[in-house]
Amino acid sequence: MAGLQLMASSLAWAQAPRINAFFPMGARAGTTVEVEMRGANLEGADVLLATGSGVTGVVEPGGAKVDERYKPLWQQKCGSCHELRSPANRSMTAAQWAATVQRMIRQNNAPISPEDADKIIQYLQSAARAGKVVAKITVAPDAPPGIYELRTATPRGVSTAALFEVSQLPEVVGVNGKLASAQRITLPCVANGCFTANGERHYYRFTGHAGERLVFNLKAFRFNETGQMFFNPVLRLLDADGNELAENHGYYELDPLIDWQCPKDGEYILEVSDLLGRGNPASVYRLDMGRLPYDTVLVPPAARTGARVAGYVEGKNTVGLRTAVDVRAPNDAGLTQLGTPFGTTQVYVSPYPVVTRPLPKAVQLPAVFAGHFAAAGEVSAYTVIGPGRYDIEAFSGRIGSPAVVRAILLGPDGNRIAAVEGDARASVELASSRPYTLRLEEASKRGGPEFAYCVEIRPARPVLECVARPDAITLRPGLSAAVEVVVTRREGVRGDIEVSAEGLPAGVSSAKTVIPPDQNVGWLILTAGPDAAPVVQPFRIVARARGQAGEASVRAVPQEVYRLNNEPRAVNRSQCVVAVRGRADFTAELAEHAPILVKPRSATPVRVLIHRMNGFNGNVVVRLLGLPSAWVANEEVAGPGVQEVTLQVRPNGADPMPFLKRDAALSPIMAILEANSDDFRFAFGGVPVQKAPNAEDELKEDR
């Protein structure tokens, strides 16, 4: 969490392009849809980037610019106001911003004069109008169904990601209305809605048939976690006279779902509303309606890298439906999402053969065993062979299954030598070339078509996990930016962890970062050459380590950090993206190019020089990242025209001895000098941190 707090601090200053919401959030394969994006700092957007294949888009030219005449007044008056200080994290209409300012004055006695209030409202409304960007998105007829990430890029840089769903159902757009004039739809379909006004309600009229099991599945929170601050959707199912038959306001956390069996032929109406009657341009939803499955898993839930996956979807309301799917697995091993016509499912992808049923001969290890417990008490047994040391890892909850798989390995003599249960892992030595028995069962003897599992038995290796944040990095030509890399050493990892970037665009480079064995956070520096051309491109961050069992290599999971109720939160993304845009307004450097020498009881001043250029005269916020755990340096603001600040590296009360007694043979701890304006975060590079020559003398004085 410390890393989240640190990164959130820098994000609060850097006003990078941000997509808070867009409408609609999806389209049918083979169609083109106009999408409205709302957010902050989106003016000048000219590129649309989508993950995967089959989804392309063009940003429409135009869009208003922010009138920043009264931005300094807003910063002065609203910098400490929770409701008004972070417009980049919210999407509200111009009228809603005006009402919020007046409410803060009226209810909280905010010290804002009527004249200043008008100016602040003018700035916020200008930002709201400029946050509107329109793009046309084309979905190819053969585009795989599922969830895609969309980003845009502006002269300021690359934006945060927003989710976009490709479906194979007819799509409609919901509008504000009344019960008596409910919108006629034909099931199955997907409805796209947005509540921009307070008190807005959407009504959908359909024909139901006796005995038909219909599902109404609304997606909002699952597409945008920040929506919980302003959108709590509610579903109500009504008969033709308006009598309530079913209601739900939260099945997938805040996303409602109704599973209903129609009692008789007739007309029925589904009502969609907000629990508190609120409206917001970011209150956007997609609503799947019809005879559709949910809580689904893919059977078998495992595939070999790059191979075709021929299986079927199981879950609730799948009886009588044709749910066969045939998709291709990605080339990267690990847990991944695969899109199907019935929703996205989690699948484990492995480089080893996948076995889906017991075979008459022994299975040569390594291998993956995948299937489902179709009936209560069902047990599967496999004969396996292959001497060596192996990891046994089980997957059930992680693939969306209600099962708790238990894997028991029996020796040639029938005695139990290893077992794992649930989403767990264990190591075992198979010393004999004789056959062993793998027994798979559901831990509580339950069963059903959706009780899927997979168990991988692979050569033992060190286990390493890694995340990288932020997921979107913007560079200026000739400058650098830092990416925080957090590692978790699970099993058998020893020594340094090397972190590097792969697939960077031409003109962008990075040096390998080393995370010593006594640290779990490092900073990867990306640098754009002085002549780097404008570009927006995904890339990968990879961490590598060694252990007694060999080498571990893992791709870092990209994370976007955002604020919810002023607390930093992280959401996983599928790609890291780097952009080269704009020009340098400033640089920063240490006045003394020497190691930072820390002391356990007193502060160490660190002078930082600010070099301004191209007429830039705004605020620059300066900080040090990656200090040893017993020291901290408060960030400093270099106001307009200021060209030097001093950071105080001081003890924070934690035990300094682990660092003071640190083995000199370990790789040094590197601090990162970072500085940012409203538009850009700049990293100076790594600076070694060492103990001062007289550091331990201060501790002697305590005695």
Task: Report each predicted region and the residues it spans.
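Bacterial N-terminal signal peptides
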Residues: 1-10
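Low-complexity "stalk/linker" and mucin-like segments enriched in Ser/Thr/Pro/Ala/Gly
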Residues: 54-64, 130, 468, 505-519, ...
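Acidic, Ser/Thr/Pro-rich low-complexity intrinsically disordered segments
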Residues: 15-29, 38-57, 61-62, 194-284, ...
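C-terminal capping alpha-helices of c-type cytochrome domains
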Residues: 107-130
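The canonical Cys-X-X-Cys-His
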Residues: 74-85, 120, 124
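Aromatic sugar-binding surface patches on proteins
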Residues: 129-136, 254, 321-323, 518-524, ...
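Ser/Thr/Pro-rich low-complexity tracts
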Residues: 13-64, 129-197, 273-284, 288-375, ...
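Sequence/structural segment immediately N-terminal to covalent heme-attachment motifs in c-type
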Residues: 65-80, 98
